[in-house]
């Protein structure tokens, strides 16, 4: 059955790989990202009914406008993937500039809340849907020089568990650790060691079937691909 999939952060990395794989399997993707160039390229490659918009999820007004536009022409998403995220430049916490710390919080945590705020009411009204908030191995453990990122991903775990307790029957919210994938984000931390892990495209072949199987019975579960 064809599903409507909402994905944030589709310009690159996991979001882009997921977009391509969902569409390849016949599903409709509603995606957003901050790169005008990449969003235009995706819309050209994957025309309607797929829809791609330039949105900074850290900006609540932009997310509100995006939701209004998307929900005017599409049903509430069957699957909402809060994927967009930033990582701080590797450094001890006391050397991370205040603005950089704020940027990580704004995208990784507030951005997730913004998307939930403007899309989940439509999912509740529809009576079904699954919200997947991307966590990380660093949302269940920690490491040096990524304290801001760890803080946001631990917060996502708690936020999602609380959200799961608030949802009406038929819906689910799950925090997802996608695993270790060779993306630009991982390369910024692991350097050459990132090549030992699967690419985003390889990962998506496993992740998409996994995500499509999620339903209300998974509500509140901590999951890992």
What are these regions (language model features)?
Residues 11-12:
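Conserved glycine-rich cofactor-binding loop
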Residues 25-41:
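Conserved glycine-rich Rossmann-like NAD(P)H-binding loop of the short-chain dehydrogenase/reductase
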Residues 54-65, 98:
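The beta1-alpha1 cofactor-binding region of Rossmann-like NAD(H)/NADP(H)-dependent oxidoreductases
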Residues 91-93, 100-102:
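Substrate-binding pocket helix/loop in short-chain dehydrogenase/reductase
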Residues 116, 152:
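Active-site helix of classical SDR
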Residues 136:
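Residue(s) in the substrate-gating loop at a strand-loop-helix junction
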Residues 169-171, 175-176, 183, 192-225:
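C-terminal helical subdomain
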């Amino acid at each position: 059955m064809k599903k409507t999939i909402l994905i944030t952060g589709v310009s690159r990395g996991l979001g882009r790989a997921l977009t391509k794989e969902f569409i390849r399997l016949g599903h409709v993707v509603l995606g957003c990202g901050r790169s005008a160039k990449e969003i235009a390229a995706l819309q050209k490659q994957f025309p309607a009914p797929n829809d791609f918009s330039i949105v900074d999820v850290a900006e609540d007004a932009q997310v509100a406008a995006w939701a209004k536009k998307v929900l005017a022409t599409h049903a509430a998403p069957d699957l909402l993937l809060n994927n967009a995220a930033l990582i701080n430049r590797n450094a001890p916490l006391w050397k991370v500039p205040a603005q950089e710390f704020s940027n990580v919080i704004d995208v990784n945590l507030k951005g997730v809340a913004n998307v939930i705020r403007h899309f989940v009411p439509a999912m509740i009204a529809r009576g079904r849907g699954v919200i997947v908030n991307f966590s990380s191995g660093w949302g269940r453990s920690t490491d040096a020089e990524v304290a801001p990122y760890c803080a946001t991903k631990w917060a996502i775990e708690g936020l999602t568990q609380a959200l799961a307790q608030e949802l009406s029957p038929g819906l689910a919210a799950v925090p997802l650790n996608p695993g270790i994938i060779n993306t630009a984000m991982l390369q910024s931390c692991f350097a050459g060691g990132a090549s030992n892990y699967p690419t985003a495209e390889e990962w998506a072949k496993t992740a998409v079937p996994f995500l499509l199987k999620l339903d209300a019975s998974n509500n509140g579960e901590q999951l890992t691909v």
